[in-house]
């Protein structure tokens, strides 16, 4: 309830309503904050990757993805198990969209400048890949990183660059 939220953060209900109209608005703000943290980690990955070393970049982003799905990560199975499936789906949708937007505006453009673009509908392809990999790793946490890497490379038509 809103009273529970206000009590947990140490504010009055009236102060809560000063900033937020309802619980959905709070949830949206929290989701945006968590997604911004994920984007910051991607920006760090992007800044430190070796230009032109696509194989290493894929290895590193697979490790990053796995860390985001770990038990305490933002994409963990625990969020669903805690009864927040609808919120989790909202989160996945928004996160995949923003991550795709970030990658298509940065890493993908750099790749295109050097190699051309082996895929069309970049944003939609990345969105589908992100949602799919999150689900795959969450459902099969023991899946080998090489398989995850191969799925990403095949989806993005990167095999000839590895």
Identify the role of each PLM range.
Residues 32-39:
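Short, basic, alpha-helical segments at the C-terminal edge of helix-turn-helix-like DNA-binding modules
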Residues 1-25, 29:
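Helix-turn-helix
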Residues 21-25, 29, 70, 138-142:
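Residues in soluble alpha-helical coiled-coils and helical-bundle/repeat scaffolds
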Residues 60, 66-93, 135, 139:
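Amphipathic alpha-helical segments used for helix-helix packing
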Residues 64-66, 116-139, 146-157:
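Hydrophobic alpha-helical segments that form the core
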Residues 29, 43-71, 126, 149:
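Hydrophobic alpha-helical connector segments
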Residues 39, 85-113, 120-124:
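Amphipathic alpha-helical packing segments from all-alpha helical-bundle domains
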Residues 28, 59, 63, 96-108, ...:
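An amphipathic alpha-helix signature
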């Amino acid at each position: 309830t809103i009273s529970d939220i206000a009590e947990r953060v140490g504010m009055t209900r009236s102060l809560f309503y000063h900033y937020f109209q309802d619980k959905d608005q709070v949830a949206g703000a929290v989701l945006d904050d968590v997604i911004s943290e994920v984007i910051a980690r991607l920006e760090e990955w992007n800044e430190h990757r070796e230009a032109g070393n696509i194989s290493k970049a894929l290895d590193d982003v697979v490790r990053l993805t796995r860390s985001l799905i770990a038990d305490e990560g933002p994409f963990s199975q625990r969020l669903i198990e805690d009864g927040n499936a609808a919120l989790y789906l909202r989160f996945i949708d928004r996160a995949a969209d923003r991550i795709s937007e970030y990658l298509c505006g940065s890493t993908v453009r750099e790749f295109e400048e050097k190699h051309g673009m082996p895929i069309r509908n970049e944003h939609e392809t990345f969105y589908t890949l992100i949602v799919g990999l999150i689900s795959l790793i969450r459902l099969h946490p023991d899946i080998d990183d090489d398989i995850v890497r191969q799925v990403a490379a095949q989806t993005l038509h990167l095999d000839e660059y590895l």
